[in-house]
Amino acid sequence: MVDKRNHYFLLHKIEELLELSASKYKTTMEIANYAKKTKNRNANKSNIKPVILAILEISGELKLNDINKLTN
């Protein structure tokens, strides 16, 4: 017979993993969409890849003005 404490513990861990997975997917999609906009806006004016620019801006490491300076 399955111990109910283990059963609830496993269910809790599964829920945690699903939430983390959904959060990572959401973040990945935000970065990808932002990178697509950045790529379209800057059209190969920079040696910095759009995904890296997106990560830096979303994380707060760079502001839009800084990115424009890098890509011009």
Curated annotation (Swiss-Prot):
Enzyme class label: transferase
Catalytic activity: RNA(n) + a ribonucleoside 5'-triphosphate = RNA(n+1) + diphosphate
GO CC, alphabetical: chloroplast; DNA-directed RNA polymerase complex; mitochondrion
Keyword Chloroplast in record: yes
Primary subcellular site in the record, as a coarse category: plastid
A GO BP entry: DNA-templated transcription
Tree of life domain: Eukaryota
Keywords carried by this UniProt record: Chloroplast, DNA-directed RNA polymerase, Nucleotidyltransferase, Plastid, Transcription, Transferase
Protein family according to the UniProt entry: Belongs to the RNA polymerase subunit omega family.
Record-linked HAMAP family: RNApol_bact_RpoZ
Designated name of the protein: Putative DNA-directed RNA polymerase subunit omega
Native species: Cyanidium caldarium
